[in-house]
Curated annotation (Swiss-Prot):
Subcellular localization: Cell inner membrane
Keyword Membrane part of the UniProt annotation: yes
Pathway annotation: Porphyrin-containing compound metabolism; heme O biosynthesis; heme O from protoheme: step 1/1
Protein topology in the membrane: Multi-pass membrane protein
UniProt-listed PROSITE patterns: UBIA
Miscellaneous: Carbon 2 of the heme B porphyrin ring is defined according to the Fischer nomenclature.
GO-annotated cellular components: plasma membrane
Keywords: Cell inner membrane, Cell membrane, Heme biosynthesis, Membrane, Transferase, Transmembrane, Transmembrane helix
PANTHER family linked to this entry: 4-HYDROXYBENZOATE SOLANESYLTRANSFERASE (PTHR43448:SF7), PROTOHEME IX FARNESYLTRANSFERASE, MITOCHONDRIAL (PTHR43448)
Designated name of the protein: Protoheme IX farnesyltransferase
Length: 287
């Protein structure tokens, strides 16, 4: 059951939800608020991941990377997977609504709808699916942000959204390159299958890395939505740029030599850079 929910993605979403709540000002959250926030978010995220697997179960059988997932691998029936998807999604929405408010619940539902009903079918139709997936992947920051008292119109929330959305370009372009043959054979329309030289994937990774750092720097100088010129702003800027540089360098190396080795380095650095930047942003907001 846990494998059905894509636990690595759920973990990443929970980390970003915590960071966004801390940046918004988590003093308003009690321990029980945190509990409901984590449970509700995990259930909705898990439901979205499960729904994605249910939708793509036939295609997943054609990819070695995904053929052993619970449904395509025959370890879980289609009916059980659908039931778990529906029950966890509904439960998560209700928990967020009752435990943290209507806005966090609505953001969670919107995330689910975009990921499942827009992003998932787009994967076999257009390479623009990555952009839609980036939006769906970044929206959960507003679950934590609004649960902690922030609003959907505040600059810090949108800079967090920008960091998460832009980070997904180098991260998923690396994956798309490494599994480009499997994606093509399964019928997925990815940037690396549409443009197999890797040039487009590389430039999207480079621009995503630059935009990620830019959003982080903006938040360093506007920690509460207002311009704050201080030593903390300068220090946060330096740390964010330093933390972001390895991912940009890896993206540039991939652009110069698009191959599996440079793609793997880009993927590995993406897994290091995101938590590092989020940590700096969270610490800056607390000063």
């Amino acid at each position: 059951m846990i494998e059905l929910t894509k636990p690595r993605i759920v973990t990443m979403i929970l980390v970003t939800t915590v960071a966004s709540a801390l940046i918004a000002g988590s003093a308003t959250l009690t321990l029980i608020d945190w509990f409901w926030l984590m449970i509700g978010t995990a259930l909705i995220a898990g439901s979205a991941g499960a729904a994605n697997q249910v939708w793509e179960c036939r295609i997943d059988r054609n990819m070695p990377r995904t053929a052993n997932r619970p449904v395509p691998g025959g370890r879980m029936s289609y009916a059980v997977a659908v039931a778990l998807t529906a029950s966890s999604g509904i439960a998560g929405s209700i928990i967020l609504w009752l435990g943290n408010g209507l806005v966090p619940a609505c953001v969670g539902i919107a995330t689910w709808l975009i990921y499942v009903l827009v992003y998932t079918p787009m994967k076999t139709r257009t390479a623009w699916n990555t952009t839609v997936g980036a939006i769906a992947g970044a929206l959960p920051v507003f679950i934590g942000y609004t649960a902690a008292g922030g609003t959907l119109t505040e600059l810090p929330g949108w800079m967090l959204f920008g960091v998460l959305a832009c980070w997904q370009y180098p991260h998923f372009m690396a994956i798309a390159w490494l599994y480009r043959t499997q994606y093509a054979e399964a019928g997925f329309c990815m940037t690396t299958t549409v443009e197999p030289t890797g040039r487009h994937a590389a430039w999207q990774s480079i621009l995503g890395s630059v935009a990620l750092a830019t959003c982080g720097v903006v938040l360093a100088w506007f920690p509460d939505g207002q311009w704050v010129a201080s030593a903390a702003s300068v220090l946060a800027t330096v740390l964010i740029l330093a933390a972001s540089w390895p991912l940009l360098r890896a993206s540039l190396n991939f652009r110069a030599n698009p191959n599996d080795k440079t793609a793997r380095k880009m993927l590995r650095w993406s897994l290091v850079v995101l938590p590092a930047v989020l940590l700096v942003m969270t610490l800056r907001a607390s000063l």
